[in-house]
Design a protein with these regions (language model features):
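Helix-rich, well-folded core regions that mediate interactions or catalysis
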Residues: 1-233
Length: 233
């Protein structure tokens, strides 16, 4: 059982693309549509998530992430997923690029599709400078935001990543604490990091969203500086 093939592409879009009106994710409806055996995949993913860092997410965000990973797992088992790029872009809204690669690697290792293995290696090369960071470095939120922003830019949905972060209610207190320990400079230049930090401390959660979005929108060089490891600083 599961989703009829005729509705597969529609369901994928509804699950993995952000709703430009409210970014709403109907977990119960999506789980129902996914089929009777879906809970087995959810249980498997919950075990694997034990090794993944997602400290910024609330319980609601963790539920979304669990569902998406389980659905990807189910699709890969059925050999209906051949392009990991779009999936990686969506997952980077929830977890850092390093963690995205880690979880996709776990999933792909179970696949007998050589094409998918090659695809994963290409993805690793693309995300290479992210993957190279320290495994315990949680201050990846802004780099995740930048990557997601760039991936959605062509579709005119730049603001929706911002809305999604707000809906998930990231733990910004923890995020700022990590930034104060200089971890943010691993991700972006310090002259961009400082204004974001102070904007948050003064105005709170809404302020950091305004600051991040403003920086990205008005500084093309900021985006360019994050496009390669050599240009980070």
């Amino acid at each position: 059982m599961g989703i009829p093939e005729s509705k597969k592409s529609i369901f994928l879009r509804s699950v993995f693309e952000l709703n430009k009106n409210n970014c709403h994710f109907d977990y119960l409806a999506a789980k129902k549509d996914a089929g009777v055996g879906f809970m087995e995949y959810t249980e498997q993913i919950n075990i694997e998530l034990a090794s993944i860092h997602y400290d910024f997410l609330t319980d609601f965000g963790k539920k979304e992430l669990t569902f998406m990973l389980a659905y990807i797992h189910q699709m890969m088992e059925a050999k209906r997923v051949s392009n990991l790029g779009p999936l990686a872009s969506i997952l980077m809204i929830y977890i850092s690029p390093e963690e995205v690669f880690k979880i996709l690697k776990l999933l792909v290792e179970r696949s007998d599709k050589i094409k998918m293995r090659d695809n994963l290696m290409h993805l690793r090369n693309k995300l290479g400078w992210h993957v190279a960071t320290d495994e315990d470095d949680h201050a990846q939120l802004i780099s995740t935001f930048i990557d997601s922003y760039i991936s959605l830019k062509k579709n005119g949905n730049r603001r929706q990543v911002l809305v999604k972060f707000y809906e998930l209610q990231y733990n910004f207190d923890f995020f700022v604490h990590q930034m104060m320990n200089s971890l943010l400079t691993v991700v972006i230049p310090i002259d961009f990091a400082i204004p974001v930090i102070f904007n948050y401390l003064i105005e709170g959660q809404k302020g950091i969203f305004k600051s991040m979005y403003g920086l990205i929108k008005s500084n093309k060089q900021f985006i360019v500086s994050l496009s390669s490891k050599d240009q980070l600083m």
